[in-house]
């Protein structure tokens, strides 16, 4: 089995000017469903392009869309597996996390990894995927400034998190592996202007962050 994961982020990882930072996206277990969702998203985008306010935009990113159009695009993925990781920036140990670019990147990777693990555990609990299956994980994230070895380290870190037992030095507990037969985790970065599912992930991340700031988390998936 292959898990296809497409993810984007919303907000700036800056605790001075922002309260929330969000990773969000889609998880697919079937390539055909993934490709169908991409075609549906593109089709709706083409309809929205008929509006004068969007004709000159290079891509329909959430930040440039009217609220009702963001909701319409969000609804395209209502039957898909969606996930989000919400970081409350002002709750972090700011001196440690924001000490330099490397510590910021390490924390962002850590948060993404744990959020993804929780999402996969939810899928296992729902019976959407099975604990014992041999699994490849294909992750594409929207492009950001990351060193080449950073991409490799994130993939290796996710593989270790999912495949091996995890011992908590805080709780002194040992947690069983999530997907012990995971074979490969590949992480790559793409451009949303050429990948409709990254644009869909952008819409999801924007919606989650909006509800964090102005609404209720209970409203996110409706």
Language model regions located:
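Phosphate-ester processing/binding pockets and catalytic centers
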Residues: 1-222
């Amino acid at each position: 089995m292959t898990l296809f994961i497409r993810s984007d982020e919303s907000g700036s990882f800056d605790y001075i000017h922002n309260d929330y930072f969000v990773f969000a996206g889609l998880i697919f277990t079937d390539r055909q469903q993934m490709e169908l969702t991409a075609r549906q998203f593109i089709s709706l985008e083409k309809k929205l392009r008929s509006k004068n306010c969007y004709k000159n935009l290079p891509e329909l990113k959430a930040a440039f869309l009217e609220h009702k159009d963001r909701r319409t695009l969000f609804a395209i993925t209502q039957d898909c597996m969606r996930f989000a990781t919400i970081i409350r920036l002002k709750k972090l140990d700011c001196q440690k996390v924001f000490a330099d670019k490397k510590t910021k990147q390490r924390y962002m990777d850590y948060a993404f990894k744990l959020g993804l693990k929780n999402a996969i555990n939810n899928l296992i609990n729902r019976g959407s995927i099975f604990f014992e299956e041999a699994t490849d994980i294909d992750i594409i994230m929207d492009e950001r400034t990351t060193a080449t070895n950073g991409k490799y380290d994130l993939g290796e870190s996710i593989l270790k998190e999912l495949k091996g037992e995890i011992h908590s030095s805080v709780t002194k507990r040992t947690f069983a592996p999530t997907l012990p037969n995971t074979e490969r985790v590949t992480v790559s970065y793409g451009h949303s202007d050429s990948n409709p599912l990254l644009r869909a992930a952008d819409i999801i991340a924007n919606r989650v962050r909006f509800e964090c700031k102005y609404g209720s988390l209970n409203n996110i998936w409706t």
